[in-house]
Amino acid sequence: MNENSIFVSIISYRDSECQWTIKNLIELAKYKENIFIGVCLQYSMNDDSDNKCFQFNFEEEYGKNQIRIIRMNHTEAKGPCYARALVQQQLFKGEKYYLQIDSHMRFVKDWDIEMINQLLQCKKPNDDNGGMVIDEKAILTCYPMGYKLPNLIPTHRFPILLVASGFGENDGFLRLGGKIVSKKLIEPCSSLFWVSGFSFSRSDIINSVPYDPNLQYLFFGEEISMSARLFTHGYNFYSPTKTLIFHLWNRDYRSTFRENNSLEIQKLEENSKKRLLILFNQNNNNINDNDDNNNNNNNNNNNNNNNNNNNNNNNNNNNNNNNSSSSSSSSNNNNNNNNNNNNSSSTNNNNNNNNNNDDGIKIELKYNLGKIKSLDDYSNYCGVDFKNKTINNKGKFGGYYEERETFFMNEIMEYVIKSQIGI
């Protein structure tokens, strides 16, 4: 495999733009042979209501080696975190770089080389000599500029920096936004947060900080929980010097997984939210490697089910069979194994190494915070107090409060651009 190979992770829920996203990203790559796409297609497999999603046969066009597919009936979809976990577990085959995007994107020409070059420009201090070295744990991430259907791409390429915008009233999870940078950047600038719709890094991130398949039906909370997990595992966030990818912010043309909203689904979503509350109300200095021993059987069972499911997908893709539903029952059954300690999830109860709570929810080590840095470290770094739900000026301006007047585009110009294409 080429040393510059890129694995592109895409999840699509009944999205007619996915096919054109795949076509665009391959056509505009400089080295098309280095691009390998793993896509989870969630659509109606029982009728032709989603035929619009398959006007372009990308699997036939590019081959099954370059396009790896999980097919799932849309009624079995369990939200973005679950789908992204399936793609990581079943379709990744050791490519060097990892690009995670949404199913409605457009790219600049030679985007593959641009992203690799910018990733290699990310530098961090060298503790040995006081100089700077390439950051091997760098992640390029931001909310991309928007595009309009069918292919209206803006001519400007302004960088976008992630900022904290507030806490959700219903769930209490941090919301993120994007501010347009007017300052000319020579190299990628440090960022405080991570987002799921554009993330480019070395592929070791898949094994180091994998998606948690137990966060079923979760939407808000995905990005800030991954931000905290990645940061505490030693990863650093950067915004590219210019726009490399575009996102369709208008959702009117497509369905979302929220169309399936039974009482059972609502309960599973609430359990996912509780998992994140546990994550943000623990002291990760008390997370130890022994937790993994308690979870080996659960994780092995989960992996075996995923492997079996992947084999089924490979054998049945052409028949459009639903090959992913068995994984969800495996994940749910594993979540029920707990030691019933009924520990409090508050920050003060720091003896809870297994991270159980009154609901029997347990966060396995590989889906937990890291040990390289603490959650308090991340709170100080990003300017967000997760316990008291406050944001200081550092968080509101993405770490560039002191130079905000010269770093960011003025609010009127930013409003005009956002109203035209969105961010």
UniProtKB/Swiss-Prot annotation:
Biological processes annotated in GO: protein glycosylation; SCF complex assembly
Compositionally biased intervals (Low complexity): 286-358
Organism of provenance: Dictyostelium discoideum
A UniProt-annotated Pfam family: GlcNAc
Function, as annotated: Catalyzes the attachment of N-acetylglucosamine (GlcNAc) in alpha-linkage onto the 'hydroxyPro-143' residue of Skp1 (fpaA/fpaB). Is the first glycosyltransferase in the Skp1 HyPro modification pathway, which results in a pentasaccharide-linked 'HyPro-143'.
pH dependence, entry free text: Optimum pH is 7.5-8. Activity is less than 10% at pH 6.0.
GO MF annotation: an example: metal ion binding
Binding site for Mg(2+): D102, H104
Further comment found in the protein's record: Present with 4000 molecules/cell.
Disordered: annotated span: 286-359
Any one GO cellular component localisation term in the record: cytoplasm
Keywords: Cytoplasm, Glycosyltransferase, Magnesium, Metal-binding, Transferase
Subcellular compartments: Cytoplasm
InterPro entries listed in its UniProt record: Glycosyltransferase (IPR021067), Nucleotide-diphossugar_trans (IPR029044)
Pathway assigned in UniProt: Protein modification; protein glycosylation
Record-stated family: Belongs to the glycosyltransferase 60 family.
Known EC number: 2.4.1.229
Record protein name field: [Skp1-protein]-hydroxyproline N-acetylglucosaminyltransferase
Major enzyme class: transferase
Activity control: Requires dithiothreitol (DTT) for activity in vitro. Activated by Tween 20 or Tween 80 in vitro. Inhibited by UMP, UDP, UTP, 4-thio-UMP, Bio-11-UTP, and UDP-Glc but not by uridine, dUDP, dUMP, UDP-hexanolamine, and CTP. Also inhibited by EDTA.
Named cofactor requirement(s): Mg(2+)
Comment field on protein domains: The C-terminal 65 amino acids are required for catalytic activity.
